[in-house]
UniProtKB/Swiss-Prot annotation:
TM annotation in the entry: 11-31
Protein name: Cytochrome P450 81D11
Gene Ontology biological-process annotations: defense response to insect
PANTHER family assigned: CYTOCHROME P450 82C3-RELATED, CYTOCHROME P450, FAMILY 81, SUBFAMILY D, POLYPEPTIDE 5
Main localization, broad class: membrane
């Protein structure tokens, strides 16, 4: 009896499985099929496993524009990079649709190795996943770090560092033109400005204690900038992390970065007299809200400030001066505006910038042609959505080619020409996106523009400038890193104007 029961149970099980497979087969054969995704055009059929990784060439912004042109000037196109689906946007209208209509869905960030290891497991304001943690970081940044009140409290630092730059240039240029290497001076200016705001110390120039420490900081910044970006194949094809030792390199760099940032925090923590630096302020908040203001959060904020306020601002100043040297008529017009509005008895100050629209247009035009990040920081689709009529599956990475958008002939008249006057037309500045767009745009853009505009205005006001040679300066960009830097460092001929004597006299005891 027991044996018969076992046989019957076996028969029932076999019949059940048989009918289940019959049902499944019929459903697959005659049931509704999954909708085929309507994806943007792609440059070619992807290779097995690697996809379109073989198409990535530096600089990425030029390569992506070339791919867009090969697809009949596609406003958006798709790539399969290893295991990741990537959409590249080359249209202002499509970028706006991404970050207005789909702003929340596309507010996430992909986890790349630099963000994971250097960015404290992607917990910084720039790299954090969209959610409560990011909203808290954004609130901290908006209220405690980048508010107008906070930035105004550091105006004396910006003006002092610019005055030091003027004195440095004037030492050898009071009696005639001298050749000057501009890049190290701009890095000195921007690093000192940010580190004084953050930690109350200078790393370059008079009053510094350790030249080796200054070189160490500059080297760290350069290495992080070169290591970052959306073009690292190891972020799309994981096996390359081990084959190329890329992840090992990033981990070592992360250790050095953390050691430096922790040293800044520790120095301020043990000081008996509290200062007015960013770290002092954040440590005071840590005492009352330790869960929010952990050391990791504080170091992440400092890291973002240093990276966003040094290399990028120095690069923009170098491009701006190069443009002025290649367009002396623009330089003359800027000088006339400053002389007419400010006079020759005092230096231009931050509150004067509002009276110098042409100077502001020069900065805007520089950022148009040479955006700080030619490829905006990548976004990640947290849910399925539609952009420009195309399906955007969850997990898709969105890359925006700001460099291509800023040179789009459909958007700009004579886009390749350096023409600050274009921004005299109302609304032209709305087309710019050098600091991103939408809720993940750079919160520190105001600080960067304040320093760059004031520094550029001071250099125009205080010195005569000429090219070292008659030929135009080389305006090609470097292929390395996430930011747009000149391939060849700027050298210029500089001669002090009479107003510099007032600066020198004021600096004497």
């Amino acid at each position: 009896m027991s044996s018969t029961k076992t046989i019957m149970e076996t028969i029932y099980l076999i019949l059940s499985l048989f009918f289940f497979f019959i049902f499944l087969s019929l459903k697959l054969l005659f049931g509704p099929r999954p909708r085929k995704l309507n994806l943007p055009p792609s440059p070619s059929r992807p290779f097995p496993i690697i996809g379109h990784l073989h198409l990535l060439k530096l600089p990425l912004h030029r390569r992506f524009l070339s791919l867009s042109e090969s697809l009949n000037n596609a406003k958006i196109f798709s790539l399969s990079l290893g295991s990741r689906l990537v959409f590249v946007v080359s249209s202002h209208a499509v970028a706006e649709e991404c970050f207005t209509k789909n702003d929340v869905v596309l507010a996430n960030r992909p986890e790349f190795l630099v963000g994971k290891h250097i960015g404290y497991n992607s917990t910084t304001m720039v790299g954090a996943a969209y959610g409560d943690s990011w909203r808290n970081l954004r609130r901290i940044g908006t209220i405690e770090i980048f508010s107008s009140l906070r930035l105004n409290s550091f105006v004396s630092i910006r003006q002092d560092e610019i005055r030091r730059l003027i004195i440095c240039l004037a030492k050898n240029s009071q009696h005639g033109f001298v050749k000057v290497e501009m890049k190290p001076l701009f890095m000195c200016l921007t690093i000192n400005n940010i580190i004084r705001m953050v930690a109350g110390k200078r790393f370059y120039g008079d009053g510094t204690e350790n030249d080796n420490e200054a070189k160490h900081v500059r080297q760290l910044i350069a290495e992080v900038v070169v290591s970052g970006g959306a073009g690292n194949a190891a972020d799309y094809f994981p096996i390359l992390r081990y084959v190329t030792n890329y992840e090992k390199h990033v981990k070592k760099l992360a250790g050095r970065v953390d050691e430096f940032l922790q040293s800044l925090v520790n120095e301020k923590r043990v000081e008996k007299v509290k200062g007015n630096t960013m770290i002092d302020h954040l440590l005071s908040l840590q005492e009352t809200q330790p869960d929010y203001y952990t050391d990791v959060i504080i170091k992440g904020i400092i890291l973002v400030m240093i990276l966003a306020g040094t290399d990028t601002s120095a690069g923009t100043l170098e491009w701006a001066m190069s443009n002025l040297l290649n367009h002396p008529e623009v330089l003359r017009k800027a000088k006339t505006e400053i002389d007419d509005q400010i006079g020759v008895d005092r230096l231009v100050e931050e509150q004067d910038i509002v009276k110098l629209p042409y100077l502001q247009h020069i900065v805007s035009e520089t950022l148009r042609l040479y955006p700080v990040a030619p490829m905006l920081l990548p976004h990640l689709a947290s849910e399925d959505c539609i952009v420009d009529g195309y399906d955007v599956p969850r997990g898709t990475i969105i890359l925006v080619n700001a460099w291509a958008i800023h040179r789009d002939p459909k958007l700009w008249e004579e886009p390749e020409k350096f023409k600050p006057e274009r921004f005299e037309k109302k609304g032209e500045d709305k087309k710019l996106m050098p600091f991103g767009i939408g809720r993940r745009s750079c919160p520190g853009s105001g600080l960067a523009q304040r320093l760059v505009t004031l520094a550029l205005g001071s250099l125009v006001q205080c010195f005569e400038w000429e090219r070292v040679e008659e030929k135009y300066l080389d305006m090609r960009e470097s292929e390395k890193g996430t930011t747009m830097r000149k391939a060849t460092s700027l050298q210029a001929m500089c001669k002090a104007r009479p107003i510099v004597h007032k600066v020198l006299d004021a600096s004497c005891p």
